[in-house]
């Protein structure tokens, strides 16, 4: 953070606050006083040497408190008339026409200029306001002159050479989907594929195209991947834009007080997209999206602290400086990271209000500022409406930013948690700007929540992390913008606060008692005790290289549970070139979700398991033991971290796993690495397959070779193979039985060489599944005897042969 820049921000906000205060524009004054105070707080954190900085902070916050009553009592200015709004739309049409004009998009520019002229003339004929008529006619004249100037070269033969160099309107072309961040849209870092790639990034396989096409339809609406062509999206229209899909479904709580849908110009005289990006100004209402609002808050805080576009870069239209701007025509486009790629979401600006005219969605404390409400609306549209089932910040922040999600459970039996190591890591990474953080409470009784000032299963934004003389603190924001922690170091704690600590944390309990904005300090120990999960979102720019694969796992492939066999699980080879000093490789598994019910009742428990098997396929879950085992969680995102310390080539097998496979899933595996690597699906060398359906029944359930009298009664099959080649044999039986098989050579064609054998087995008997893989089996005739470990274990089985040459099979017994 730059202390000088923050000091300048504070001066600018204070000047605007005083100006609005003198003009009687109290709502805007309140907003800017708060922003001035926040800028000073951040400036002090960054090492500002300004004198009496805490006094100034208190002064601004006290003025905020004093103005609240004035805001309530002051009558609002009359809203703009329809004809004044038409003039604003005409101005926007001309502005957009001028942008197309500058780019040389002649036909687009002419169309927009013409529509502006028609709107000006129509409105001028409807209004009796002479001043307004003059403005409309003047604007119409300017637009008409430019439209005619552009049209003239297109109609004169002697200007054909000149006009040939001018761009004419071409239909936008949407090619294959981008695999990662679009190089035309954002420039954080180059995402270069270690696989085959072209000049613009990674190529798609036919399977990937089908996966992304299938999961483009979310809750019945298609959200296409965001492409460079979408930067030419049209936003200017003579009439207010209305989403063709209609209004969003409201939540039950909204319906109880809902009055109507309004546009920003129905609420304020001066709608603006963004006055200033601030986490302090964001307020959640009755939509159950606390994690989403917390995600907005920390994204805004990050953008403010590090002066890097994060949340403001996802909403369009934007001006030439890349700043989102208010559109009087009411159309907006938001880029969200959904189901493997950034996707395009179109919304109008209609928002729900109650009978008092108060918004029933999240909003900025500056009622003229729109970005909070519009980004929330875009996300709610994708999720099927404001009747949002709830989420977590990992999911929401990934959708908003594309940053890498990680989950730290503080009270989990399956995940170890180190309080000291976690704080040290969070402190260092937070202040470097590497990570966004939220914290969520777990289930608690109403009495517990009331006692501690906490909301059960609620997400809080982490705004700051500090350490002072061995004491460790986290600053949190409740998305409700009220209701704070009541335990140690709350504003009412008279025992633990010292003048020294207050100065270090820029916190005055007496001032805080005057206004509840939902922001508070809590000790790290108390957070670990009373909160349940910390959600992290990591900046992908930390990694030099990244690539991904989009794929599908069919529910019909393999057993419901993979506790005994991984033969049908998707598997990938990851080969990493680790430099001196070590490196980190992260693998993110993301399941695509296309239905609100699936989102609300996520029953798919996914994980990623890592094996050190040189990139070869793994068949048994515990043989060899996993290098990194996965915890199966019902979240759409699962992050695996591989830490390398030894220089050289490291090769891993990555296995996608589920707890109980109920449905076909579509997913993306994305690898982030600080060093070069290759990543690909493990190919099958086999081109032919044959299955035998058999059963152990009565006498033929003879058991293993330990039971000599009955073993000879087991089914016996014979197979003929004409050429030497690789062979994979798999036996699948009832899970409650341990199964195995033997292969016995009957006759070998020619010299078998080193690959000849008399007898081979599948090894130890295993529950429900076993296999034998031979790199080169000589041509010849072989018998195979499948059996259960114990006699009299009856049931069906499948015997699968996978090869590169035809195999003939017969049953001998």
Swiss-Prot record:
Q: In its keyword annotation, does this UniProt entry include Phosphoprotein? A: yes
**What is one Pfam family matched by this protein?**
MIT
Ranges where the record places region Domain III: 541-701
Subcellular location(s) per record: Nucleus
E.C. designation(s): 3.4.22.-
Please name the top-level EC class of this enzyme: hydrolase
Tissue distribution is: Ubiquitous.
- Where is region (Domain N) located? 702-813
> Which residues are annotated as modified residue Phosphothreonine in the UniProt record?
95
Q: Which GO terms describe its biological process?
A: positive regulation of epithelial cell migration; proteolysis; self proteolysis
Q: List the disulfide bonds.
A: none
**Which positions are catalytic residues?**
290, 458, 478
Q: Which stretch is the leader sequence? A: none
Q: Give me the Gene Ontology terms describing cellular component.
A: centrosome; cytosol; nucleus
> What keywords tag this UniProt record?
Acetylation, Hydrolase, Nucleus, Phosphoprotein, Protease, Repeat, Thiol protease
Question: What CDD domains does the record point to?
Answer: CysPc, MIT_calpain7_1
- InterPro entries on file: Calpain_cysteine_protease, Calpain_domain_III, Calpain_III, Calpain_III_sf, MIT_dom, MIT_dom_sf, PalB/RIM13_Calpain-like, Papain-like_cys_pep_sf
Its main localization is: nucleus
Q: Name one GO molecular function term.
A: MIT domain binding
Which positions bear N-acetylmethionine? 1
- Family stated for the protein in its record: Belongs to the peptidase C2 family.
- Functional summary from the UniProt entry: Calcium-regulated non-lysosomal thiol-protease.
The name this protein carries in UniProt is Calpain-7
The record lists the organism as Mus musculus
């Amino acid at each position: 953070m730059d202390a000088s820049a923050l000091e300048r921000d504070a001066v600018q906000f204070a000047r605007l606050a005083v100006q609005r205060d003198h003009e009687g524009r109290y709502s805007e004054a309140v907003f800017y006083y708060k922003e001035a105070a926040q800028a000073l707080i951040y400036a002090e954190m960054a090492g500002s040497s300004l004198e009496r900085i805490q006094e100034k902070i208190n002064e601004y916050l006290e003025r905020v408190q004093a103005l609240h009553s004035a805001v309530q009592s002051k009558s609002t200015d009359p809203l703009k008339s329809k004809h004044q709004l038409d003039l604003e739309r005409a101005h926007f049409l001309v502005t957009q026409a001028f942008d197309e004009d500058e780019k040389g998009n002649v036909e687009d520019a002419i169309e927009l200029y013409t529509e502006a002229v028609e709107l000006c003339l129509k409105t001028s004929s409807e209004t009796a306001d002479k001043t307004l008529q003059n403005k409309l006619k003047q604007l119409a004249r300017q637009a008409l002159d430019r439209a005619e100037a552009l049209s003239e070269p297109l109609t004169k033969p002697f200007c054909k050479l000149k006009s040939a160099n001018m761009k004419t309107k071409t239909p936008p072309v949407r090619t294959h989907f981008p695999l990662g961040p679009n190089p035309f849209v954002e420039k954080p870092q180059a995402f270069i594929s270690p696989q085959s790639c072209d000049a613009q990034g990674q190529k798609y396989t036919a399977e990937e195209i089908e996966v992304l096409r299938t999961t483009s339809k979310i809750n019945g609406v298609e959200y296409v991947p965001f492409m460079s062509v979408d930067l030419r999206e049209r936003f200017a229209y003579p009439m207010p834009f209305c989403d063709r899909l209609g209004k969003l479904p409201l939540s039950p709580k909204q319906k109880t007080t809902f009055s109507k849908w309004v546009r920003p110009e129905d609420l304020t005289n001066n709608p603006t997209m963004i006055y200033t990006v601030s986490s302090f100004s964001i307020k959640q209402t009755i939509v159950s999206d606390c994690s989403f609002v917390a995600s907005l808050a920390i994204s805004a805080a990050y953008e403010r602290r590090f002066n890097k576009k994060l949340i403001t870069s996802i909403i369009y239209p934007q001006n030439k400086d890349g700043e989102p701007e208010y559109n009087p025509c009411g159309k907006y486009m938001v880029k969200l990271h959904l189901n493997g790629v950034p996707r395009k979401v179109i919304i109008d600006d209609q928002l729900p209000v109650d009978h008092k005219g108060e918004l029933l969605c999240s909003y900025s404390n500056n009622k003229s500022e729109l970005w909070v409400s519009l980004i929330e609306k875009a996300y709610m549209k994708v999720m099927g409406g404001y009747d949002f089932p709830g989420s977590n910040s990992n999911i929401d922040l990934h959708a908003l930013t594309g940053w890498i999600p990680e989950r730290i459970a503080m009270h989990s039996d399956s995940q170890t948690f180190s309080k000291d190591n976690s704080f040290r890591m969070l402190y260092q990474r937070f202040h470097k700007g590497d990570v966004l953080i939220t914290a969520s409470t777990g289930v608690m009784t109403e009495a517990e929540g009331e006692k501690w000032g906490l909301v059960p299963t609620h997400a809080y934004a982490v705004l700051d992390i500090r350490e002072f003389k061995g004491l460790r603190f986290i600053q949190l924001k409740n998305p409700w913008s009220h209701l704070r922690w009541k335990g140690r170091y709350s504003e009412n704690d008279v025992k633990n606060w010292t003048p020294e600590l207050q100065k270090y944390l820029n916190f005055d309990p007496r001032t805080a008692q005057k206004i509840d904005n939902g922001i508070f300090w809590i000790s790290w120990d108390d957070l670990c005790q009373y909160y349940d999960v910390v959600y992290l979102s990591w900046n992908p720019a930390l990694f030099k290289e990244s690539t991904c694969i989009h794929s599908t796992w069919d529910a019909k492939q393999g057993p419901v549970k993979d506790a005994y066999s991984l033969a049908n699980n998707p598997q990938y080879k990851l080969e990493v070139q680790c430099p001196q000093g070590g490196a980190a490789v992260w693998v993110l598994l993301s399941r695509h979700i296309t239905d609100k019910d699936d989102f609300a009742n996520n029953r798919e428990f996914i994980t990623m398991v890592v094996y050190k098997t040189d990139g070869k396929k793994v068949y048994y879950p515990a043989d060899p033991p996993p290098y990194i085992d996965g915890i199966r969680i019902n979240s759409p995102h699962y992050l695996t971290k591989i830490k390398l310390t030894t220089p050289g080539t490291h090769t891993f097998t990555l296995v996608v796993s589920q707890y109980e496979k109920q449905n076909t899933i579509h997913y993306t595996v994305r690898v982030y690495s600080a060093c070069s690597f290759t990543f690909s699906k493990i190919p099958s060398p086999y081109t032919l397959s044959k299955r035998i359906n058999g059963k152990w029944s009565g006498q033929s359930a003879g058991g293993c070779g330990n039971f000599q009298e009955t073993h000879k009664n087991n089914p016996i099959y014979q197979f003929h193979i004409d050429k030497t080649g690789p062979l994979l044999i798999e036996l699948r039986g009832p899970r409650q039985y341990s199964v195995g098989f033997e292969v016995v050579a009957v006759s070998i064609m020619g010299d078998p060489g080193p690959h000849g054998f008399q007898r081979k087995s599948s090894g130890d008997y295993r529950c429900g599944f076993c296999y034998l893989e031979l790199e080169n089996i000589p041509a010849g005739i072989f018998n195979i005897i499948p059996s259960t470990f114990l006699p009299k274990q009856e049931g069906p089985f499948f015997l699968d042969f996978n090869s590169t040459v035809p195999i003939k099979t017969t049953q001998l017994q």
